[in-house]
Amino acid sequence: MIVGIPKEIKNNENRVGMTPAGVNELVKHGHTVYVQKGAGENSGFPDSSYERVGAKILATIEDVYAISEMIVKVKEPIAPEYPLIRKGQLLFTYFHFASDRRLTEAMMSSGATCLAYETVELKDHSLPLLIPMSEVAGRMATQEGARFLERPQGGKGKLMGGVPGVKPAKVLVIGAGVVGYSAARIAAGMGADVTITDLSLIHISEPTRR
């Protein structure tokens, strides 16, 4: 199969649909992979890192869509990409169709087969492709919270872990899902006094087991 990885063009999106390690696996299994020039740069993957594992670099997003049977992205296509998507093409990305009627109608009209990562579900009803994003969100929440405790940011000048003679910050995490657990784990690692609340007793007990 011919797989294409375009550069993300949505504002402030710096991720790339596939790392060189993922490309390497596809190439080893006989697939051809095209990567748009600069697609991985903002994620720390220069074009050369893709070329080393067998990918071919194309200059434009139009070139990638035109040649590829399957497109692998991170974020949903935006309006300039709609005309590039064709019937029979496979498109893998986070779509979030429910919040964007125009996107939904455009994809239906295109005739492409669209797989929304956020809807992939295991037998236990977990959403494995949302877990990495949720873990990042939880960790960033704690980091940002700690930053806004600093005086220059308008905070009280309190360290998360405290210092000798000064108690650590108290952190309340509402919700013990993947995001909440990740936030709580980072806060605890920084030495904060952490409390987690959740409506589910099962969720509350999970961090303890982990």
Give, region by region, the residue ranges found by the protein language model.
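Short beta-strand "acidic-cap" motif of Rossmann-like dinucleotide-binding folds
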Residues: 35, 116, 194-198
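N-terminal Rossmann-fold NAD(P) dinucleotide-binding loop
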Residues: 180-181
